Regions:
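Conserved C-terminal guanine-recognition region of P-loop GTPase G domains, centered on the G4
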Residues: 152-168
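Inter-motif core of Ras-like GTPase G domains
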Residues: 126-146
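Pre-Walker A adenine-sensing motif
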Residues: 1-5
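Inter-lobe coupling/hinge region of RecA-like P-loop helicase motors
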Residues: 215-249
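Hydrophobic positions on the alpha1 helix immediately C-terminal to the Walker A/P-loop
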Residues: 25-26, 30
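Beta-strand-loop-alpha "switch" segments that mediate conformational coupling across diverse proteins
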Residues: 180-229
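P-loop/Walker-type NTP enzyme "switch/lid" segment
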Residues: 7, 15-21, 35-115
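Gly/Ala-rich phosphate-binding loop of Rossmann-like dinucleotide-binding domains
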Residues: 31, 35-36, 132
Length: 261
């Protein structure tokens, strides 16, 4: 989109124009892998006032920990070895998100290098468009549904055009991400819209995320040794096989210049 010097921390937004495309699940998985495995100091801002998926995930996990001595003991051992607390998650309104983040950054002693924003399910309002332009990067998951793809591409083009035309806009790039792909289904829609994205100069991740019931496995279902979606643990490595998650995380780090050193 455009090349500007990225300031620290990097602001990374997750936005979609349709509910149920896996936006929050992907944000949760990315945050936990980057923080717990790759050592990236980060914080999460849940702006999705209607769902609050990220914030409510943490709340559910706290309840499970309170109710299960075994899980509590295993997590205690994990964090004792990890040497740090869980990353911060706070909820706020979209129009207050940036102010809240700045307050957090001035109050914390941790050198936060990445802030992940989970946007509401419909990112088309004025407040959300303004917030979009204040991100460094946006990840927008899409599914092979022509009706929802129209609005997703319209949002991507709006952010791109405003990001280029407004000199003070922070946004550097928005990337679409094919998500929940059925391996046995036809790729006609995916191929068509991938070509369309190229023709419109809209960036797509090379990696694709494949449909899997494993994304729904929280602490309550899988326990510490079988969890996929958690704010306290990264997805169990063996469960990621075939999902595209590992490849996607590596591409995120490369494209957004998130150093793991």
């Amino acid at each position: 989109m455009k090349s500007v010097q990225t300031v620290s921390p990097i602001y990374l937004g997750f936005a979609s124009q349709k509910g149920g495309v896996g936006k929050s699940s992907l944000a949760e998985v990315l945050a936990s892998i980057l923080y717990y495995e790759k050592g990236i100091p980060l914080a999460v801002v849940d702006c999705d006032g209607t769902q609050e998926s990220f914030y409510k995930l943490r709340e559910r996990e706290r309840n499970i920990i309170d109710e299960s001595p075994d899980i509590a003991e295993q997590l205690k051992a994990f964090f004792s070895k990890f040497g740090k607390r869980a990353y911060t998650i706070f909820r706020t309104k979209p129009e207050e998100a940036l102010i809240q983040v700045k307050q957090l950054l001035t109050q914390t002693e941790e050198d936060i290098r990445l802030v992940i924003f989970d946007f509401p399910g419909h990112a088309g309002t004025t407040e959300l468009l303004n917030l979009s332009l204040e991100m460094d990067y946006i990840i927008s998951p899409i599914e092979a549904d022509p009706q929802s793809l129209v609005s997703s591409f319209a949002y991507a083009k709006t952010v791109r055009d405003l990001g280029i035309s407004l000199e003070d806009a922070r946004i550097q790039d928005l990337l679409l991400l094919w998500n929940k792909i059925n391996r046995s289904a036809s790729t006609v829609v995916i191929d068509h819209y991938s070509d369309y994205a190229k023709s419109e100069d809209i960036n797509l991740f090379d990696t694709r995320i494949y449909h899997s019931v494993k994304f729904a496995r929280e602490l309550a279902q899988g326990g510490v040794k079988g969890v996929f979606r958690s704010s306290y643990l990264p997805p169990v490595a063996s469960l990621r096989t075939g999902t595209g998650v590992n490849e996607w995380v590596e591409e995120v780090c490369r494209r957004f210049k998130i150093s793991t050193e």
